[in-house]
Design a protein with these regions (language model features):
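Conserved catalytic core of the tyrosine transesterase superfamily
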Residues: 2-284
């Protein structure tokens, strides 16, 4: 496969076709509707207002954040909504929540116990959660459906920016080409690379085609890869479960590796790992 072909593949994976985009949007819409069934009824109006301004994946992220927010409010014994049923909260209940309650929520998000699992969030993740809460309050306040907007009184976490180095399309194509061909390697490196080429191509294609984090990629279990629905199940940095859909190019690369993976014998404790190292352990 030459460089030109790889560039075409990259564009298809990143930009996606209109048909795939519609399918992806439908899947995310179904997921959002399922989440809204367990959230306060008034949130349906808010998410309807986002229909033509936010991408489906963004709305899913907002729903996760607000789900965590309302879980905190009904489970925290200092909250004015403590002990109430999350799904049956009324819009008027938002007026009972103070800026101190929201600050408590952000502090809680730093690290909390979720059914025996410790969930942590970075400052950027906490900032996103506050943005989600602010967006909800801003909408209902603007529509004169609540009396105040306490979220504006809560300071945003300070995020230290890092320079992001991005690859151009031709650089990505060359990278994938080198992975497949083993170009620019020593004889020893080429020998090792030949054994891992299918895995490495699958790993890189998945990363580039979905935008997931490296940690999410290497953390995949065999059962997390769903070829029936062309999606993977990942656990986000904040501990939230998410499904990410992939296109045909990613699917083909993953199937090639999955077939090769069947012949490997993982070390004890690594049987569930999808991506294996040379030592047949989970990557990482």
């Amino acid at each position: 496969m030459d460089l030109y072909q790889f560039i075409l593949i990259y564009k298809e994976v990143i930009m996606a076709g209109s048909t795939y985009s519609r399918q992806e949007e439908a899947r995310y819409t179904l997921q959002l509707n399922k989440m809204l069934d367990a959230l306060p009824r008034f949130l349906v109006e808010y998410f309807n207002s986002l229909e033509f301004t936010k991408q489906p994946r963004t709305k899913i992220a907002y729903a996760y954040d607000l789900d965590t927010f309302f879980d905190f409010l009904v489970q925290n014994n200092r909250s004015p909504l403590y002990g109430m049923d999350k799904a049956f909260l009324r819009l008027s209940d938002l007026d009972k929540v103070t800026s101190e309650d929201i600050s408590d929520f952000l502090r809680y998000c730093k690290a909390y116990d979720n059914n025996g699992k410790i969930v942590t969030n970075s400052d950027s993740a906490i900032k996103r959660k506050l943005c989600s809460v602010r967006g909800m309050y801003k909408y209902f306040y603007r529509m004169d459906k609540i009396k105040s907007n306490p979220s504006t009184q809560v300071d945003m976490p300070v995020i230290h920016e890092h320079n992001i180095v991005r690859l151009e399309a031709n650089e990505v194509a060359e990278l994938l080409d080198n992975v497949e061909s083993g170009a620019k390697l020593t004889k020893h490196q080429a020998k090792v690379q030949k054994k891992l080429a299918v895995r490495d191509l699958a790993l890189l294609t998945l990363l580039l085609g979905t935008g997931i984090r490296v940690s999410e990629c290497v953390g995949l279990d065999i059962t997390d890869v769903d070829f029936d629905n062309d999606r993977i199940r990942i656990i986000r940095k904040g501990g939230a479960e998410s499904f990410v859909y992939f296109g045909n190019e990613v699917r083909e690369a993953l199937i090639d590796y999955a077939n090769e993976r069947k012949d490997k014998i993982p070390l004890k404790g690594h049987e569930n790992a999808f991506f294996l190292s040379r030592q047949n352990k989970r990557l990482g």
